[in-house]
């Protein structure tokens, strides 16, 4: 079961420490889950106590340059749940855009700012060029940094730079993020696709109670290859802070057994029931539609966001960006 981590760079002692850290957090913060691993159905107990959600300071080598590109107006009369000003949109980059031309990055900023203004969301950019982790692994420390900067925020939405928000009039709460909509939206009795080539192990619950919805901490979608971290949301909670901190561990990236951060997230979900119990799987087109694929995957007019995943492979980012930019509503 732990053969994934038995590389020279990871000792048995580290494995034990890692497991203890995960278990400690969920028990220490009152999140108790009784997993039935055969079908991944979880019985939930509500926390006995409320805990401080403030994230502790990061190590200096994990702190990038943070810039607020839009600040939401605090509106306590907002009837949405969560309130709009309690949501932070997040983008991070090391400045190396590759085939994703610099003018497209400017377009990306403009697109996100327009949406943030219309929906009254915060929008944060983190420059991760100084971080001592590969750029693709910079998402986790950027999230941690943003969690600390916005202690009153409830949710953080990560969206890759090669994505356009196509429907600016559609709010996250209206689409899926309110508790009532989330209860309706999460995929049920669906296998979580395993990118490691093993048999699918986790299956999403057959139903979600209100208590289960309250415990969901991580929202993501999957394509035909598995989880896709081009677009996902996390709660601003200590549980997520610890998970992000562990995923940032250089040993996990240096081991070379996964190519991307999303593969490691998938591994934690597959192998750790406590992590799995925090995760909700959304239909892909809700937050991460592609420009091509089957109907459940391919963007359709009215969908929120369009992710040009892999556009850099054939140097088509600019072509696709221009094609779909005129279809924004």
Swiss-Prot record:
GO MF terms listed in the record are: alpha-1,2-galactosyltransferase activity
Q: Name one GO biological process term.
A: protein N-linked glycosylation
Q: Does the keyword Glycosyltransferase apply?
A: yes
Alphabetic keyword roster? Glycoprotein, Glycosyltransferase, Golgi apparatus, Membrane, Signal-anchor, Transferase, Transmembrane, Transmembrane helix
Q: Which residues cross the membrane?
A: 15-35
| Topology feature Lumenal, residues | 36-329
What domain of life does the native source organism fall in? Eukaryota
What does the similarity note say? Answer: Belongs to the glycosyltransferase 34 family.
Query: What is the name of this protein?
Result: Probable alpha-1,2-galactosyltransferase gmh1
Organism in which the protein naturally occurs: Schizosaccharomyces pombe (strain 972 / ATCC 24843) (Fission yeast)
Gene name as annotated: gmh1
């Amino acid at each position: 079961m732990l053969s994934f981590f038995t590389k020279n760079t990871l000792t048995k002692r580290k494995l034990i420490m890692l497991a203890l850290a995960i278990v400690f957090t969920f028990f220490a913060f009152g999140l108790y889950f009784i997993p039935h691993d055969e079908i991944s159905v979880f019985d939930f107990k509500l926390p006995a106590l409320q805990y401080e959600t403030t994230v502790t300071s990061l190590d200096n080598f994990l702190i990038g340059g943070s810039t607020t590109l839009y600040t939401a107006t605090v509106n306590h009369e907002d009837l949405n749940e969560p309130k709009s000003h309690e949501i932070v949109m997040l983008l991070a980059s090391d400045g190396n855009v590759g085939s994703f031309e610099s003018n497209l990055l400017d377009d990306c900023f403009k697109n996100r700012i327009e949406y943030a203004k219309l929906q009254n969301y915060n929008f944060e950019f983190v420059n991760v060029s100084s971080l001592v982790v590969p750029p693709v692994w910079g998402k986790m420390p950027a999230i941690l940094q943003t969690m600390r900067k916005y202690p009153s925020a409830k949710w953080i939405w990560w969206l890759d730079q090669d994505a356009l928000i196509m429907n600016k009039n559609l709010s996250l709460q209206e689409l899926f993020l309110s508790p009532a909509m989330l209860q309706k939206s999460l995929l049920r009795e669906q296998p979580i696709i395993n990118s490691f080539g093993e048999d699918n192990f986790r299956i999403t619950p057959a139903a979600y109670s209100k208590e289960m919805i309250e415990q969901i901490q991580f929202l993501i979608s999957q394509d035909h290859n598995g989880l896709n971290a081009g677009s996902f949301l996390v709660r601003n909670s200590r549980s997520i802070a610890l998970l992000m901190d562990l995923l940032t561990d250089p040993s996990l990236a240096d081991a070379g057994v996964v190519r991307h951060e999303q593969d490691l997230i998938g591994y934690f979900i597959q192998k750790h029931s406590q992590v799995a119990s925090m995760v909700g799987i959304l239909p892909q087109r809700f937050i991460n539609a592609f420009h091509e694929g089957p109907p459940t995957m391919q963007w359709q007019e009215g969908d929120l966001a369009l992710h040009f995943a892999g556009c850099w492979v054939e140097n088509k980012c600019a072509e696709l960006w221009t094609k779909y930019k005129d279809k924004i509503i």
